Amino acid sequence: MPLTNVIYCGVCDFPAEYCEFSGKFKRCKAWLQENHPELYTKWYGDVTEDVSKQLAESSIGDEREEKLEKALEKLERKQQAREERELAKKLSSKVVIRREARTKRKCMIAISGLEVFEIDMKKLSKTFASKFATGCSISKNAEKKEEVIVQGDLADEVEAYIHSLLEEKGMKEVKVEVIDAAKKKKKAETTTTPGSENKK
């Protein structure tokens, strides 16, 4: 079986028969006409067409393609810079899981800082409600930002789930801070118990 001699285009580096998919078709055709006229005739017609007209059109095509390529490169650079800024913002942000006392024996978990990571809060709330079989809702904190409220002492379980969720999004390095406000409150109440000053 004879080997097939593949002609590669000097403009786009594709096999010559695939130049139309390169985005540089006019320049590719001009190159093919100059370097392989027999293939040009076979694929695109008679070589005896007005060469000067072809070259002129090719020149105009070159300018248009160059402008288009530059515009695309500029757009890609802007997009890349935007993505880098967004990634830096995400990596420098943190998720806060706060354990708060509701009554003496009951507490709730408030999760904030998720909006930066494009996490669907409603979906997450439903996931927590079904996963932990508990009440779950969305409210706004003192900073007017949304947070997920989970009823029950589930700080460890919530933390583990948030870590796995961030890891799925490629955000493994993001800090997850757990604050036990219930303990702090209890400690503060203990230190200010009436009569405690007289015992010193």
UniProtKB/Swiss-Prot annotation:
InterPro entries registered for this protein in UniProt: DENR/SUI1_TIF, DENR_C, DENR_eukaryotes, DENR_N, SUI1, SUI1_dom_sf
Single GO molecular function: mRNA binding
Chief location: cytoplasm
Name of this protein: Translation machinery-associated protein 22
Family: Belongs to the DENR family.
One of the GO biological process terms: formation of translation preinitiation complex
Entry keywords, A to Z: Cytoplasm, Ribonucleoprotein, Ribosomal protein
SUPFAM superfamilies named in the record: eIF1-like
Keyword Ribonucleoprotein: yes
Gene3D superfamilies referenced in this protein's UniProt entry, alphabetically: SUI1-like domain
Free-text comment on this protein's domains from its UniProt entry: The SUI1 domain may be involved in RNA binding.
Cellular localization per UniProt: Cytoplasm
Organism: Kluyveromyces lactis (strain ATCC 8585 / CBS 2359 / DSM 70799 / NBRC 1267 / NRRL Y-1140 / WM37) (Yeast)
One GO location term (cellular component): ribosome
Subunit: Interacts with the 40S ribosomal subunit.
Domain (SUI1) ranges: 95-166
